[in-house]
Protein backbone atom coordinates (compact mmCIF):
# COMPACT_ATOMS: atom_id res chain seq x y z
CA UNK A 1 0.00 0.00 0.00
CA UNK A 2 1.12 3.57 -0.55
CA UNK A 3 2.07 5.76 2.39
CA UNK A 4 -1.14 7.73 1.96
CA UNK A 5 -3.36 4.63 2.07
CA UNK A 6 -1.41 3.23 5.05
CA UNK A 7 -1.82 6.49 6.95
CA UNK A 8 -5.57 6.43 6.31
CA UNK A 9 -5.81 2.71 7.08
CA UNK A 10 -8.02 2.05 4.06
CA UNK A 11 -7.74 -1.48 2.69
CA UNK A 12 -9.96 -2.34 -0.29
CA UNK A 13 -11.40 -5.86 -0.37
CA UNK A 14 -11.60 -8.38 -3.21
CA UNK A 15 -10.79 -7.02 -6.66
CA UNK A 16 -11.31 -3.43 -5.57
CA UNK A 17 -8.74 -0.65 -5.89
CA UNK A 18 -8.37 2.58 -3.90
CA UNK A 19 -7.61 5.55 -6.16
CA UNK A 20 -7.38 9.31 -5.84
CA UNK A 21 -8.67 11.29 -8.80
CA UNK A 22 -6.41 13.96 -10.24
CA UNK A 23 -7.85 17.46 -10.13
CA UNK A 24 -9.30 18.66 -13.41
CA UNK A 25 -9.01 22.30 -14.39
CA UNK A 26 -12.36 24.09 -14.26
CA UNK A 27 -11.20 26.92 -16.53
CA UNK A 28 -9.93 26.86 -20.09
CA UNK A 29 -6.63 28.46 -21.10
CA UNK A 30 -8.41 31.68 -22.04
CA UNK A 31 -9.99 31.96 -18.58
CA UNK A 32 -13.40 30.65 -19.61
CA UNK A 33 -15.12 28.67 -16.85
CA UNK A 34 -16.02 25.20 -18.10
CA UNK A 35 -19.35 23.64 -17.08
CA UNK A 36 -19.30 20.03 -15.89
CA UNK A 37 -20.85 18.90 -19.18
CA UNK A 38 -17.83 20.23 -21.10
CA UNK A 39 -15.31 18.27 -19.04
CA UNK A 40 -13.98 14.84 -19.98
CA UNK A 41 -16.05 11.71 -19.40
CA UNK A 42 -13.06 9.87 -17.92
CA UNK A 43 -10.76 10.79 -15.04
CA UNK A 44 -7.11 10.13 -14.41
CA UNK A 45 -6.45 8.65 -10.98
CA UNK A 46 -3.49 7.36 -8.99
CA UNK A 47 -3.69 3.83 -7.58
CA UNK A 48 -3.09 4.02 -3.81
CA UNK A 49 -3.96 0.49 -2.64
CA UNK A 50 -5.07 -2.89 -3.96
CA UNK A 51 -7.54 -5.34 -2.47
CA UNK A 52 -6.85 -9.01 -1.83
CA UNK A 53 -7.64 -9.90 -5.44
CA UNK A 54 -10.05 -12.18 -7.23
CA UNK A 55 -9.87 -15.96 -7.52
CA UNK A 56 -10.63 -18.06 -10.58
CA UNK A 57 -12.90 -21.14 -10.65
CA UNK A 58 -10.05 -23.32 -9.33
CA UNK A 59 -9.31 -21.03 -6.40
CA UNK A 60 -6.12 -19.64 -7.92
CA UNK A 61 -5.37 -16.01 -7.11
CA UNK A 62 -5.60 -13.79 -10.21
CA UNK A 63 -3.02 -10.99 -10.42
CA UNK A 64 -4.08 -7.35 -10.63
CA UNK A 65 -3.39 -5.61 -13.93
CA UNK A 66 -2.34 -2.45 -12.08
CA UNK A 67 0.17 -1.64 -9.36
CA UNK A 68 0.26 0.92 -6.57
CA UNK A 69 1.51 4.18 -8.05
CA UNK A 70 0.09 3.58 -11.54
CA UNK A 71 -1.94 6.36 -13.15
CA UNK A 72 -5.15 4.85 -14.52
CA UNK A 73 -8.14 6.03 -16.51
CA UNK A 74 -11.54 5.46 -14.90
CA UNK A 75 -15.05 6.53 -15.86
CA UNK A 76 -16.11 9.78 -14.21
CA UNK A 77 -19.07 8.10 -12.50
CA UNK A 78 -17.53 4.74 -11.58
CA UNK A 79 -16.75 3.47 -8.12
CA UNK A 80 -17.75 4.40 -4.60
CA UNK A 81 -16.61 7.84 -3.48
CA UNK A 82 -15.52 8.45 0.10
CA UNK A 83 -14.09 11.42 1.97
CA UNK A 84 -11.52 10.87 4.72
CA UNK A 85 -9.93 13.77 6.60
CA UNK A 86 -11.13 16.20 3.93
CA UNK A 87 -9.57 14.24 1.04
CA UNK A 88 -11.71 12.54 -1.62
CA UNK A 89 -10.98 8.96 -2.70
CA UNK A 90 -12.73 6.41 -4.89
CA UNK A 91 -12.89 2.64 -4.54
CA UNK A 92 -13.35 1.00 -7.95
CA UNK A 93 -13.42 -2.58 -9.13
CA UNK A 94 -10.61 -3.74 -11.41
CA UNK A 95 -13.16 -4.10 -14.24
CA UNK A 96 -13.89 -0.35 -14.00
CA UNK A 97 -10.30 0.58 -14.88
CA UNK A 98 -10.27 1.54 -18.56
CA UNK A 99 -6.50 1.82 -19.07
CA UNK A 100 -3.13 2.23 -17.40
CA UNK A 101 -1.44 5.41 -18.61
CA UNK A 102 2.25 5.14 -19.42
UniProtKB/Swiss-Prot annotation:
Q: What is an example of a GO molecular function annotated in this UniProt entry?
A: metal ion binding
Protein origin, superkingdom: Bacteria
- Coarsely, its chief localization is cytoplasm
Q: Where is the signal peptide?
A: none
Q: Where in the cell is it found?
A: Cytoplasm
Q: Does the keyword Amino-acid biosynthesis apply?
A: no
Which keywords, in A-to-Z order, does the entry hold?
Answer: Chaperone, Cytoplasm, Stress response
* Coiled-coil ranges per UniProt: none
Record-level GO cellular component terms: cytoplasm
Q: Which InterPro entries match?
A: Chaperonin_GroES, Chaperonin_GroES_sf, Chaprnonin_Cpn10_CS, GroES-like_sf
Q: Does the keyword S-adenosyl-L-methionine apply?
A: no
What Pfam family does this protein match (any one)?
Answer: Cpn10
- List the PROSITE patterns hit by this protein, alphabetically: CHAPERONINS_CPN10
Q: Per the UniProt entry, what are the Gene Ontology biological process annotations, in alphabetical order?
A: chaperone cofactor-dependent protein refolding
Q: Which Gene3D superfamilies match?
A: GroES chaperonin
Query: How does this chain assemble?
Result: Heptamer of 7 subunits arranged in a ring. Interacts with the chaperonin GroEL.
Family, similarity comment = Belongs to the GroES chaperonin family.
User: What does the UniProt record say this protein does?
Assistant: Together with the chaperonin GroEL, plays an essential role in assisting protein folding. The GroEL-GroES system forms a nano-cage that allows encapsulation of the non-native substrate proteins and provides a physical environment optimized to promote and accelerate protein folding. GroES binds to the apical surface of the GroEL ring, thereby capping the opening of the GroEL channel.
Protein name per the record = Co-chaperonin GroES
| Species this chain originates from | Chlamydia trachomatis serovar D (strain ATCC VR-885 / DSM 19411 / UW-3/Cx)
Amino acid sequence: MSDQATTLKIKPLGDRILVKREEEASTARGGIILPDTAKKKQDRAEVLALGTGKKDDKGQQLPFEVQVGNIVLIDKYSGQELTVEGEEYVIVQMSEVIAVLQ
